[in-house]
Amino acid sequence: MKIRLVQYRDIIDCMRFDGSYHNADVNVYDSVIRKHSQHQLSHFCSEIFSTGRNKRTYTTPDFGYPYLSNSDVIAADPFMSCKYCSRKYDFDDKAVLREGMILTGRVGAIGQTSLVPSYFEKAKAMGSDNIIRIVIKPEYRKGFIYAYLSSKIGRLSFWKYATGGVQPFITETMVGLLPIPQFSQAFQKEIDNLIQKSITLRENAFNKLKETQNLILSELSVNISKRNFGKVSISDILQSHNSRFEANFHISEGADIERYL
């Protein structure tokens, strides 16, 4: 059984025993962080925002910009699994994920954070309306702040401010209330340098992954984008029952590629 002590001065502040005295790790961490914190997250940010929800027209990668969800932004190859929004009708400059932004989930993926690499912005990748963007002021170390927010204590802090029963959510204002611990400048610089190196390694890993994918396709002598996958031949239709389109004629590019391989 886990127990913890509650100081009398904490009770005097609110003049009652309330629900916040339940024995949760986040309460212990929060009390420690607040003793070593001078500012909330909003103090270090020029902007904390999420974009509005608009009508979207999905298309193929050749005619669209990447549209990333919370799960896509942390994937090794986000452009492989994401959807693509029409370049002609759906481009939203405000939704583009800029290099150095800290991302966190607004609904569902609360506490899941990531730091935007440069290739997101180069691809004009847009983030969904369920992603909260945290823009750190230039004079502060975004690598250090990201490292704290992505730590166990940081993730629990998000959930302390989250609300909602059936579908938990957190707002931009709530995110701005998170306390950020105060450390020495030397320690912050050390953490920031390590995070910057990790971002460089991630970008290099992404580039190498694309190179290996292209080598495999080249070795197989197949250009997926140029082949007529997803087509149904006339002979298949004529041989079907009553010479009609059957349910199994649905376009499955993956199945066609598998048969080709």
Task: Cite the ranges covered by each PLM segment.
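Well-ordered mid-protein domain cores that form the structural environment of catalytic cofactors
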Residues: 73, 91, 103-113, 146-162
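Short, flexible loop/turn elements at secondary-structure junctions
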Residues: 72, 101, 107-108, 138, ...
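Sequence-specific dsDNA recognition surfaces
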Residues: 38-56, 71-99
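A short beta-sheet element
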Residues: 95, 99, 103-147
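A short glycine-rich beta-alpha junction/loop motif
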Residues: 124-132, 164-189
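Short coil/turn segments at secondary-structure boundaries
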Residues: 54-63, 160-162, 227-230
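Non-catalytic DNA-recognition/assembly elements of restriction-modification systems
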Residues: 1-54, 184-261
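Short, surface-exposed loop/turn microsegments at beta-strand edges and helix-strand junctions
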Residues: 57-65, 74-83, 94-97, 115-129
